[in-house]
Amino acid sequence: VYGGQSINTGAVNSNTVTINGGSVAGGIRGGQSAGGTVTGNTIDLNGGQVAGKAYAGYSNNGTVTGNTINLDGKNGINITGAWLYGSNATATGQNNNTLNIRNFKGRAQNIGNFDRIDLDLAGLTLRAGDPIIVLTEKETTRLGNSTIHIHTGGNAIAHTNSALVPRYEVIKNKTDAGLTAENVKYEKGQITVRQNGALQALYKVEWDGPGIDSVDGDSIDLVKTGETEIVPGTETINESRLALTDFLNAAGDFILDRKLQCSLREDGSIPETCFYGAVSGGDLHHDLNGNKAWAHTTGTHWFIGLRSKLNEKQDTEKDLNGALYIEAGWGNIDTHNRWAKGNGDIHYYGIGAIGERKQKEGNWKSTYLQAHARIGRAFSDYNSRLKDGSGEKLDYDKNSTYYGAGLEIGREWQYHPDYMLDSYLKYRWLHLNGFNTEINGADHKLDDIDSHRTRLGTRLNYTAEKTGMPYIGIAWEHEFDGNARGSVMGYSLKDTSLKGDSGVLELGVKFVPSEKSRWNYDFTIEGYVGQREGVMGNFVVNYLF
């Protein structure tokens, strides 16, 4: 098959032969002249079966320059019986006859006489002892005087399903004839090879021969140049878990910030037992330490509970109250760091208990102490946009147990008949169990997460109207820990955490339809600034039995 041909001294320029399928048995000439120049001719090998000698350019007496063979194995091509040559003359490095190899893994008879070889290995699977291109002719493969270039762009990622090794063979003559690469120039650049989409290392292209003019070498290799490391951005998996932790923290705040108060009876007394329930919706953004990372959560929280007085009515010194509740929530998460983004769905179910003691007389009158504990199960279905060399994304669908506890101490000051100031200090701990999982063939060990927070604040309540009592509050919150740690195939993930300070502003109103109503309502808007930013809206319904 000829792209162009001259049987005398005519020039043969700019012809193209394209093979997309079928069978070619007798060789190919991109351009051929008996005595003229042959320039700018191209052979595109995209599919089918090709045998015989394929010359990008061929001239008996003229110059052969700027001719190209493009070998693309994307659609499958068999060149087991083919020889690929840039020209019929030995390469000098000056004639720009080029072989471009892309998406190809297979066998050929031999290659040679190219001034430039361009390797695009993106997406290919590398294995130790399994060359990308195997040459089977018992004649030395001569790549001398050429320039070998390897694609190094952002998408130039090969992959392997086994441990990264010091060398991978790319072009290998499997016979005793060997492969020579004297005076070869290796253009600067390295390719990333990823193991199971989790670990990676940089590799450069290099001949395996010991020296110039030696025939002891037999391959062009990828040679490891740096240490094995976790793929940057893989910590996105822990960022998603921090998003879940923050969502659970918001749920706890929502429940625990609601005072255990029932609607008053008609005579003004406090009932012993009441039912209460609430719903909250929020949109929160949390900056995570390091790598310009953040986590964003949106969703709703629900709970229903039963509050009861625990001490005798005749006790004039103190009030003891307790509550049991069921909690649940559903939401969405988005995460971002310098290298990767992700999103997912989360939900949880749990139970909890709250106990409160309030002093009714003495020097500590109106001082209260609250303790709580909660436990449940949290579920996360997360998908990141971080890909391995084969295009597989890092994702998981797991669930784990969470539990927590905390203390709150505060005091109410009725410094004016119409105004009451409630100041408090809160400590809250939440624990989210870690888990082990396999993602794209890589073992991930994700450690437990512990959140330790304090909140110092005060709330001003207007108490003149019993049917409508607005309030405003401010608080400072500090997260001491909230670190997410883990490892991938024994290599430690970069730490990321919720640690930091946030400010809280709340505006709300408590109201009852009438003084005789068994219903009590509480509506609050909370705004956050700092490490945690966003808005929460809470609505509580309280019913007297």
Regions found by a protein language model. Name each.
Residues 352-356, 440-545:
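Outer membrane beta-barrel transmembrane domains
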Residues 63, 73-169:
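Extracellular beta-strand/loop-rich repeat segments of large surface/secreted proteins
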Residues 229-415, 522-531:
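Outer membrane beta-barrel translocator domains of Type V secretion systems
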Residues 292-296, 339-345, 385-395, 438-446, ...:
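Flexible, surface-exposed loop regions and adjacent strand-edge segments
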